[in-house]
A protein has these predicted regions:
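Ribonuclease/tRNase effector modules and their secretory precursors
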Residues: 1-76
């Protein structure tokens, strides 16, 4: 399990699982990929800084949108 603190909206998590076949619980492991890429999400950063994390989880490349809030990684 990642050592960072993660949070997300459970309704959005269920919608993401249905649409993309990956839960936010699974997505947090993308941050552990030593070859992960973190990139700024300029398109969605007008109200707060948002980022992408692209990493490999169980053989799949996952793209995770997130922000930092009060020391916690918030997944969208």
């Amino acid at each position: 399990m990642p050592q960072h603190s993660f949070e997300w909206d459970e309704e959005k998590n269920l919608a993401n699982l249905k649409e993309h076949g990956a839960s936010f619980g699974e997505a947090q492991f993308a941050f552990l990929d030593p070859r992960r890429i973190i990139a700024h999400d300029e398109k969605h950063s007008s109200r707060e800084e948002r980022w992408f994390c692209m990493g490999k989880v169980e053989g799949r490349i996952l793209t995770v949108r997130f922000t930092y809030r009060h020391g916690t990684i918030r997944i969208f």
